[in-house]
Amino acid sequence: MAQKYDVMVIGPVSVDYNIDYLGNERREIGGAVVASGFAAAGSGARTAIFCKLNEKDADVEERFRGVQADVYWKASSATCSIRNQYFTADKEKRQCTSLGVCDPFRFEELPQMETAVYHFAGLVYGDFDGALFEEASRHGKV
């Protein structure tokens, strides 16, 4: 019997360099796919996560350790990477610089399984295109 999911969260893993207003820098592995994936799984929804990254930059198993979801991933020539320079303690003002972009997502590379909702958790222009959204909408809610 094929797997069935309430939601599939799709997006790039990101290597983020976050610099606070005092100049302290933290390297963090995250991105919208990580935050949304943990949130969806934590809600009790049957969750699949599909992400892309270059495996030399981050360990998928380590980053998603403890998530109550099935995690799928595909190698990318590059990993999404963002530098955030914050100028205030409340982090309301920042400069955001793209340092790397993963390969675009295509519907045919997603795990082929029944999914009620496709949640696209992108970070930069080019992660997704209209053809991906159109095809996903034929298979579930977008």
Residue ranges of predicted features:
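Conserved N-terminal subdomain of the carbohydrate kinase-like
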Residues: 4, 15-27, 42-121, 126, ...
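Short catalytic helix/loop segments, enriched in acidic residues and glycine
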Residues: 25-38
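Active-site metal-binding loops of divalent metal-dependent hydrolases
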Residues: 11-13
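Extreme N-terminal starter segment of soluble prokaryotic enzymes
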Residues: 2-8
